[in-house]
Amino acid sequence: MARVKRGVVAHRRHKKILARAKGYYGARSRVYRVAFQAVIKAGQYAYRDRRQKKRQFRALWIARINAGARQNGLSYSRMIDGLKKAQVIIDRRVLADIAMHDAVAFAALAEKAKGALAA
């Protein structure tokens, strides 16, 4: 059986990792051993942060809704409760967008929530 030298395979593997580490600082983009660790860690961060992104955006939406609700004399939780009781089906992403860009429409929603809470 012929001897298999793995130089070509190793070179390809190293090239692939170094390509993924392109743009990293210092040895992280030049030295295979360090680049490999950096790429693995980057993958772990990416995996973790894809999940965290969902939480962070929801927290941002809630903060924006809360700010808008307080300008209209409600707290966030009372606003959401009032909208649910008024059977207004609108998600937090859209509600936050309305709070940011259309104060008049948000005030109308707040009044609707207040009405449902009073009833």
From Swiss-Prot:
Q: Which InterPro entries match?
A: Ribosomal_bL20 (IPR005813), RIBOSOMAL_L20_CS (IPR049946), Ribosomal_protein_bL20_C (IPR035566)
What keywords were assigned to this record? Answer: Ribonucleoprotein, Ribosomal protein, RNA-binding, rRNA-binding
Q: Which GO terms describe its molecular function?
A: rRNA binding; structural constituent of ribosome
Pfam families (alphabetical)? Ribosomal_L20
Keyword set includes Protease? no
One GO BP: translation
Signal peptide: which range, if any? none
Q: Name one GO cellular component term.
A: ribonucleoprotein complex
CDD domains registered for this protein in UniProt: Ribosomal_L20
Q: What does this protein do?
A: Binds directly to 23S ribosomal RNA and is necessary for the in vitro assembly process of the 50S ribosomal subunit. It is not involved in the protein synthesizing functions of that subunit.
Family per record: Belongs to the bacterial ribosomal protein bL20 family.
Which PANTHER family does the entry link to?
39S RIBOSOMAL PROTEIN L20 (PTHR10986)
Task: List the protein's name.
Answer: Large ribosomal subunit protein bL20
Please name the source species: Acinetobacter baumannii (strain AB0057)
Source species taxonomy? Bacteria, Pseudomonadati, Pseudomonadota, Gammaproteobacteria, Moraxellales
